Amino acid sequence: MEALTLWLLPWICQCVSVRADSIIHIGAIFEENAAKDDRVFQLAVSDLSLNDDILQSEKITYSIKVIEANNPFQAVQEACDLMTQGILALVTSTGCASANALQSLTDAMHIPHLFVQRNPGGSPRTACHLNPSPDGEAYTLASRPPVRLNDVMLRLVTELRWQKFVMFYDSEYDIRGLQSFLDQASRLGLDVSLQKVDKNISHVFTSLFTTMKTEELNRYRDTLRRAILLLSPQGAHSFINEAVETNLASKDSHWVFVNEEISDPEILDLVHSALGRMTVVRQIFPSAKDNQKCTRNNHRISSLLCDPQEGYLQMLQISNLYLYDSVLMLANAFHRKLEDRKWHSMASLNCIRKSTKPWNGGRSMLDTIKKGHITGLTGVMEFREDSSNPYVQFEILGTTYSETFGKDMRKLATWDSEKGLNGSLQERPMGSRLQGLTLKVVTVLEEPFVMVAENILGQPKRYKGFSIDVLDALAKALGFKYEIYQAPDGRYGHQLHNTSWNGMIGELISKRADLAISAITITPERESVVDFSKRYMDYSVGILIKKPEEKISIFSLFAPFDFAVWACIAAAIPVVGVLIFVLNRIQAVRAQSAAQPRPSASATLHSAIWIVYGAFVQQGGESSVNSMAMRIVMGSWWLFTLIVCSSYTANLAAFLTVSRMDNPIRTFQDLSKQVEMSYGTVRDSAVYEYFRAKGTNPLEQDSTFAELWRTISKNGGADNCVSSPSEGIRKAKKGNYAFLWDVAVVEYAALTDDDCSVTVIGNSISSKGYGIALQHGSPYRDLFSQRILELQDTGDLDVLKQKWWPHMGRCDLTSHASAQADGKSLKLHSFAGVFCILAIGLLLACLVAALELWWNSNRCHQETPKEDKEVNLEQVHRRMNSLMDEDIAHKQISPASIELSALEMGGLAPTQTLEPTREYQNTQLSVSTFLPEQSSHGTSRTLSSGPSSNLPLPLSSSATMPSMQCKHRSPNGGLFRQSPVKTPIPMSFQPVPGGVLPEALDTSHGTSI
């Protein structure tokens, strides 16, 4: 018996030792703000203790330590305390800072560490970059899979074809986690904006309205149409509510909420509070079959955690589920360790001592855990070589619309780490939602956009016009119907003092109409409260004005030149004439002192002016001019007249061939500078606000709009403005009033006017346009915009424009019946050069005349010899008598007449005694001459001769001696000087038959006949 006892004692001791080692002690560290981690951990240990399939006789004990959030020092202290108690593994659920500190400790002590990362404040988590172990042995295992949100978001924006969007994140989110996403988005050419959201979300939106202008808010609203929210569910709900309340969100906005942890009730809250489309990305776990929903690997899970009807599961966070599966993974490893009988006893470790050695069973326990494979609440869990759990799956939910249930959520696709995206994220075409719908349309009568076509009693009004045609084309393409009615006040929409809106805009804001269409322009103020489609027609402001009446002028031939030019030309004619007269008088005085010549044709004032006028009209009339001064004067005058006549001809041709409306007002600048005509627009209209904004802008350098606004806003607009466009058109037709309004409207009024009495001028350049107004946040805006662009591409809009604004209508705006010459009269400054040329010529002529007078007077005084006297007629008579006395017996003069020319002879000195004149009756020779300035009649002498007498001189009645001019005495002394201003005086001799002249003339005489 004793021998049997001794033989069984070692076995009994071994069994006792195994039973003692079968008590499994686990340490746990949680943050104090995670109360559910503690409860779930205890629930997991309780479930495993009751499961005999995993641990038959083994019992799990645990020690839990609670630390502050993000306190690594406290985490290390509590972990050392647990190691002193002796633990087989450490399970933690903390942030990244505490996890890094615990990793270093567990790596040094060889204690397996199962780490579950928590979401910071419910915000999306970012990856924890754990420090690698120096010896390459990492004892920390990440139970929760790495963050894959960047991959999901990149695939999502790619599927949605976003090119520009904004990402909002809160203070709890580590923006460094987006670095990889931003790098990939940059390579794809995406425009990504980041904006941090403070905890006081209402303050964020309030600051936007205080720091941004209206244009900036409109751009910010466009940015919000595509947004990704990296916020907590509560933060996202508050953010969307503020965006909707401040009218920064619209029905065509698309919100993408990305967070691994969000419950179904939270999703529904987001969907119902948001305007537009909502997409939610969250992590999901595979659901088990109904008969196995509470069983995982033969492990019975508490119904609180596996039965959705209990409701407790919906309240758990993802970190709680991974914490439960981490305990299950440890229990599975302990079970396999016990089966393999490779159990290592727990050891008390003192991490403060330097001599403390790590647990020798840590490596074996770590390998067993890493080889484990379980299926828990989160699905499959196992660890790869990098100590991470790779299995993760995401669900992508999207909003749906229905007539019965309104807005709801449906599953669009899933994403997992192995297969990627499974499903389609493309938005369902919105056009299908309009099929069969009836929209309420509000409008305002405005020709030719909207007009009443028929008005039958008892039936709704029928409308026609350009905007109605566009609406019909959209209804046909999209398959919807519409009911149209007029705005009660007949206005487009203007913000009142109480911040409310009237007109069509007010109808949209109050939800009484789905859309508004007419000649409504897209303005920043209107776009802040309603949405607009793409413009279907450009907009500009024009001036409707009455055409000027036709003016007939019989003096239009004077139009090519300005009055000052005509005055200068009229003054130049007598000035030049007087100068020519003076020059001729000077020349005549000089000539009288020598020969007393006959006055020239320009010696009188009226004759000189007549010569000038003849040259001006290019008809001649001037006598021969030999003086240098006269030639300079006439040359300058001829050049002057050539330029003047050529310019007159060219400009007159321009006046006759180029003609258009001669209206003094052609631009807004012309309108602002005149005061004879009043002008205005419709009060409280878009045009009214346009001039107000331009006229009151201190940065506007052009003062034109400021002057226009002063006139338009006089007396609050009551003096010059009208209440409706039709009133303004009627007022412009009456005359003396310019109506400023949309070019499209006033052009139609001018084209269809019965009298064609008005025209449109002064188009302004504007970036505005006519669009379709919809309720703020309407989901149909993009659909209408797309169809409008299609109508533009196909040319259908151009066809509709030609229908209502024909190029050849009743009135032609390109030509006018009252067209007048549009050329410009040449001003005096344009002719200053030619008048300068004339003045220089006249001055030069005066100078030359003075020099010529001085030169000739001095030269004649010095060079005239005493013996070189000009013979007069008496000398000729005496010479002829002497010749006849000497040779009368045998010299005869031919019966032909003898003409003596080239004898411009001056008289002798008054004191000289003349020889008596002898008569030769028998020769019957007649001598005739004309003496200028001495007498007004001719003097003749007759010499008689016998009929048989002959003169052997080569003279005949038909022969004329050439005229001669001499300034020096000839060698034979027979030539006389002739004054350059005197004309040759012919002398005729009529011989009588029987007269005999001497046979030859004495060459010694100084008279030539």
UniProtKB/Swiss-Prot annotation:
Give the SUPFAM superfamilies listed for this entry: Periplasmic binding protein-like I, Periplasmic binding protein-like II
Transport in keyword set: yes
- Residues of the region (Disordered) are 930-954
Name the domain of life: Eukaryota
Give the subcellular location: Postsynaptic cell membrane
Positions on the Extracellular side per record topology: 21-562, 659-830
Record GO biological process:
modulation of chemical synaptic transmission; negative regulation of synaptic plasticity; phospholipase C-activating G protein-coupled receptor signaling pathway; regulation of postsynapse organization; regulation of postsynaptic membrane neurotransmitter receptor levels; social behavior; synaptic signaling via neuropeptide; synaptic transmission, glutamatergic
| Residues the record lists as binding Ca(2+) 1 | 527, 530-531
- Where is the major localization of this protein? membrane
Q: Which UniProt keywords apply?
A: Cell membrane, Disulfide bond, Glycoprotein, Ion channel, Ion transport, Ligand-gated ion channel, Membrane, Postsynaptic cell membrane, Receptor, Signal, Synapse, Transmembrane, Transmembrane helix, Transport
Cytoplasmic topological domain ranges are 584-637, 852-1009
Q: How does it sit in the membrane?
A: Multi-pass membrane protein
Q: Where is the composition biased (Low complexity)?
A: 943-954
Instruction: Show the CDD domains listed in the entry.
Output: PBP1_iGluR_delta_1 (cd06392), PBP2_iGluR_delta_1 (cd13730)
Name one cellular component (GO) term. Answer: trans-synaptic protein complex
UniProt keyword Coiled coil, yes or no: no
Q: Where is this region: Interaction with CBLN1?
A: 21-436
**Alphabetized InterPro entries for the sequence:** ANF_lig-bd_rcpt, Glu/Gly-bd, Iono_Glu_rcpt_met, Ionotropic_Glu_rcpt, Iontro_rcpt_C, Peripla_BP_I
Transmembrane parts of this sequence: 563-583, 638-658, 831-851
MF terms from GO for this chain are:
AMPA glutamate receptor activity; G protein-coupled receptor activity involved in regulation of postsynaptic membrane potential; GABA receptor activity; identical protein binding; transmitter-gated monoatomic ion channel activity involved in regulation of postsynaptic membrane potential
Site residues (Essential for dimerization), renumbered to this chain: 73
Q: Which residues are glycosylated?
A: 131, 200, 422, 498
Q: Quaternary structure per UniProt?
A: Homodimer. Interacts (via extracellular N-terminal domain) with CBLN1 (via C1q domain), and more weakly with CBLN2; the interactions mediate the trans-synaptic adhesion complexes also with neurexins and are required for ligand-gated cation channel activity.
Q: What does this protein do?
A: Member of the ionotropic glutamate receptor family, which plays a crucial role in synaptic organization and signal transduction in the central nervous system. Although it shares structural features with ionotropic glutamate receptors, does not bind glutamate as a primary ligand. Instead, forms trans-synaptic adhesion complexes with presynaptic neurexins and cerebellins, regulating NMDA and AMPA receptor activity and influencing synaptic plasticity through signal transduction.
Name the family.
Answer: Belongs to the glutamate-gated ion channel (TC 1.A.10.1) family. GRID1 subfamily.
| The protein's name in its UniProt record | Glutamate receptor ionotropic, delta-1
